[in-house]
Amino acid sequence: MTTAEHLDAYLKAMGNRDVEGTKVHMADNVVLRSPIVPAPFVGKERVADVLTQLLATVDAFEPKLLLRDGADFVAVFTIRLGDHVIDGMDHMHLNDAGLVDSMTVAWRPLPSVVAVQQKLAPKLGGKAMMLVPADQSA
Protein backbone atom coordinates (compact mmCIF):
# COMPACT_ATOMS: atom_id res chain seq x y z
CA MET A 1 0.00 0.00 0.00
CA THR A 2 1.42 3.40 -0.93
CA THR A 3 1.65 6.21 1.59
CA ALA A 4 -1.17 8.12 -0.10
CA GLU A 5 -3.36 5.01 0.07
CA HIS A 6 -2.61 4.66 3.80
CA LEU A 7 -3.61 8.27 4.46
CA ASP A 8 -6.72 8.16 2.27
CA ALA A 9 -7.85 4.95 3.99
CA TYR A 10 -7.07 6.39 7.44
CA LEU A 11 -9.14 9.53 6.79
CA LYS A 12 -11.97 7.52 5.26
CA ALA A 13 -12.04 5.33 8.38
CA MET A 14 -12.14 8.44 10.60
CA GLY A 15 -15.02 9.87 8.57
CA ASN A 16 -16.85 6.54 8.94
CA ARG A 17 -16.09 6.42 12.71
CA ASP A 18 -14.17 3.18 12.16
CA VAL A 19 -11.35 3.29 14.71
CA GLU A 20 -10.35 -0.32 14.02
CA GLY A 21 -9.90 0.72 10.39
CA THR A 22 -7.52 3.52 11.42
CA LYS A 23 -5.29 1.20 13.46
CA VAL A 24 -4.13 -0.67 10.34
CA HIS A 25 -2.48 2.57 9.20
CA MET A 26 -0.75 3.45 12.50
CA ALA A 27 2.72 2.48 13.64
CA ASP A 28 2.84 0.62 16.97
CA ASN A 29 4.75 3.55 18.50
CA VAL A 30 2.51 6.33 17.12
CA VAL A 31 2.47 9.58 19.14
CA LEU A 32 -0.59 11.87 19.26
CA ARG A 33 -0.24 15.46 20.46
CA SER A 34 -3.73 16.81 21.11
CA PRO A 35 -5.25 20.14 22.16
CA ILE A 36 -7.38 18.24 24.71
CA VAL A 37 -4.67 17.45 27.29
CA PRO A 38 -1.04 18.66 27.54
CA ALA A 39 0.73 15.27 27.59
CA PRO A 40 1.03 13.28 24.35
CA PHE A 41 -0.67 9.92 23.90
CA VAL A 42 1.78 7.16 22.94
CA GLY A 43 1.15 3.79 21.30
CA LYS A 44 -1.38 2.46 18.82
CA GLU A 45 -3.84 1.17 21.44
CA ARG A 46 -3.80 4.40 23.47
CA VAL A 47 -4.21 6.56 20.36
CA ALA A 48 -7.04 4.31 19.18
CA ASP A 49 -8.72 4.79 22.56
CA VAL A 50 -8.44 8.57 22.18
CA LEU A 51 -9.96 8.39 18.69
CA THR A 52 -12.76 6.16 19.99
CA GLN A 53 -13.58 8.67 22.73
CA LEU A 54 -13.35 11.62 20.32
CA LEU A 55 -15.69 10.04 17.78
CA ALA A 56 -18.13 9.03 20.53
CA THR A 57 -18.15 12.61 21.83
CA VAL A 58 -18.55 14.67 18.65
CA ASP A 59 -21.52 14.69 16.31
CA ALA A 60 -19.47 14.60 13.10
CA PHE A 61 -15.91 14.29 11.80
CA GLU A 62 -15.65 15.36 8.16
CA PRO A 63 -12.33 15.03 6.26
CA LYS A 64 -11.89 17.86 3.74
CA LEU A 65 -8.39 18.00 2.25
CA LEU A 66 -5.03 16.23 2.35
CA LEU A 67 -1.75 18.04 1.62
CA ARG A 68 1.57 16.24 1.25
CA ASP A 69 5.28 17.03 1.40
CA GLY A 70 7.37 13.86 1.41
CA ALA A 71 6.58 11.83 4.53
CA ASP A 72 4.64 14.73 6.07
CA PHE A 73 0.93 15.27 5.54
CA VAL A 74 -1.63 17.78 6.72
CA ALA A 75 -5.22 16.59 6.92
CA VAL A 76 -7.84 19.34 7.04
CA PHE A 77 -11.19 18.44 8.59
CA THR A 78 -14.31 19.75 10.31
CA ILE A 79 -15.66 18.55 13.65
CA ARG A 80 -19.20 19.29 14.80
CA LEU A 81 -20.52 19.20 18.36
CA GLY A 82 -23.98 20.70 18.81
CA ASP A 83 -23.80 24.29 17.58
CA HIS A 84 -19.99 24.23 17.61
CA VAL A 85 -18.05 23.85 14.36
CA ILE A 86 -14.31 23.25 14.62
CA ASP A 87 -11.83 23.70 11.79
CA GLY A 88 -9.01 21.24 12.38
CA MET A 89 -5.67 20.25 10.96
CA ASP A 90 -3.58 17.20 11.76
CA HIS A 91 0.10 17.26 10.89
CA MET A 92 0.92 13.60 10.34
CA HIS A 93 4.25 11.95 9.69
CA LEU A 94 4.73 8.55 8.09
CA ASN A 95 7.53 6.15 8.95
CA ASP A 96 9.53 4.18 6.37
CA ALA A 97 6.77 1.54 6.22
CA GLY A 98 4.23 4.24 5.28
CA LEU A 99 2.44 4.09 8.63
CA VAL A 100 1.41 7.11 10.70
CA ASP A 101 3.97 7.50 13.50
CA SER A 102 3.19 11.04 14.61
CA MET A 103 0.10 13.27 14.73
CA THR A 104 -0.09 16.84 15.99
CA VAL A 105 -3.58 18.32 16.12
CA ALA A 106 -4.58 21.99 15.80
CA TRP A 107 -8.19 23.19 16.16
CA ARG A 108 -10.02 26.52 16.04
CA PRO A 109 -11.98 28.56 17.16
CA LEU A 110 -11.02 28.46 20.82
CA PRO A 111 -14.56 28.56 22.33
CA SER A 112 -15.55 25.49 20.29
CA VAL A 113 -12.31 23.70 21.17
CA VAL A 114 -13.01 24.31 24.86
CA ALA A 115 -16.56 22.94 24.44
CA VAL A 116 -15.15 19.66 23.07
CA GLN A 117 -12.31 19.66 25.62
CA GLN A 118 -14.79 19.91 28.50
CA LYS A 119 -16.57 16.75 27.34
CA LEU A 120 -13.57 14.76 26.12
CA ALA A 121 -10.76 15.46 28.63
CA PRO A 122 -12.44 13.71 31.60
CA LYS A 123 -12.95 10.59 29.45
CA LEU A 124 -9.19 10.57 28.79
CA GLY A 125 -8.09 11.14 32.38
CA GLY A 126 -7.62 14.90 32.00
CA LYS A 127 -9.34 17.88 33.57
CA ALA A 128 -12.03 19.95 31.89
CA MET A 129 -10.99 23.56 31.33
CA MET A 130 -12.94 26.80 31.16
CA LEU A 131 -12.56 29.73 28.81
CA VAL A 132 -12.90 32.91 30.88
CA PRO A 133 -12.71 36.44 29.43
CA ALA A 134 -9.66 38.33 30.76
CA ASP A 135 -11.82 40.97 32.46
CA GLN A 136 -13.59 38.19 34.42
CA SER A 137 -10.51 36.28 35.60
CA ALA A 138 -9.42 36.32 39.22
Spans of features found by a protein language model:
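C-terminal and inter-domain tail/linker signature
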Residues: 1-138
